């Protein structure tokens, strides 16, 4: 679009001034983008303790990404690739850097994102690397077809393990890419995202979660396979927690993982620029006022009023920096049911999910170092 001098420039300049004034007013009144209001967990998101009552399949230190090939579950454990055989984790391969994303293709090739800004295509059978390509801050991977890989890049400023730093710096430099394995070409899809953390193919449409925006978006393409975006709409917003990986079921429903809760104290800190700058520079990251995979393990952690233990007991409804939550969405992308591990629970930091037949749902509890199995009735 051509911009004519004079009137058009005045309109653009005036809009910028009005936007700046609106931002200042919102900051003063605590509304709009400066609001610290957190939606309650109610209705289909009402708290329960189902995750704490489910079967513990196995314990894996720093378990994160789950993916399925055939009848087996594969997982990441820091820099190790693990295969779960008869409820026992077996190390398949060890890498020099932390694994940040996993995705199997129909041909049996495993895409692996590493924290050194690299994506590998790995032959699990031969235990060999087929190809290696550079991508910044890989947070999620998805094989669209045997030759096409969708890549989520969380940030241009921080690596995937530094997700808390990106949140505290109000990061919005994430992006989605399409990579052709045969030609090794990259195609940019969409940018300026606030930490895209999950990808899912649904009827030739792309579903992705945006953690710091507390939302899930649906991209529709103009034609199958061309990756020209026809529409990009927000289908789920104002979530009470930070969304992560997404997996679809055989009946085209969705399981959405949410790895940590939002709360008003964190939302308030995110509006205080000077305070955040001092906290990031002077305080150990473990003790930031920020979400966590697991909290309550150190007396030096920040304490919220409702989180004080009474008679040595932490109330399940206490405000916490960690939580366990996974939500099932129906075909209209509305919450159908939710599984929780509350403040006093033992299945926090649900980062990833994988589905097997007969309603089996496997979940990685990064905060409590275990894989749990939920069987839907």
What are these regions (language model features)?
Residues 11, 20, 30-62, 329-342:
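A short helix->beta-strand "capping" segment at the edge of beta-propeller domains
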Residues 52-58, 88-94, 126-132, 185-190, ...:
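A short beta-strand motif characteristic of beta-propeller blades
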Residues 59-69, 96-107, 134-148, 155-157, ...:
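Beta-rich, blade/repeat-based domains predominating
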Residues 74-79, 111-117, 150-167, 207-213, ...:
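Conserved beta-strand positions in repeat-built beta-propeller and related beta-rich domains
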Residues 84-88, 123-126, 180-184, 220-225, ...:
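Short loop/turn segments that connect beta-strands within beta-propeller blades
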Residues 117, 126-144, 152-165, 171-173:
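Asp-box/WD-like beta-propeller blade repeats and closely related beta-sheet repeat scaffolds
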Residues 152-171, 259-321:
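Short, conserved, GDST-rich strand-edge loop motifs in beta-rich repeat architectures
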Residues 350-377:
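Blade-level signature of beta-propeller repeat domains, shared across WD40, Kelch, NHL, RCC1
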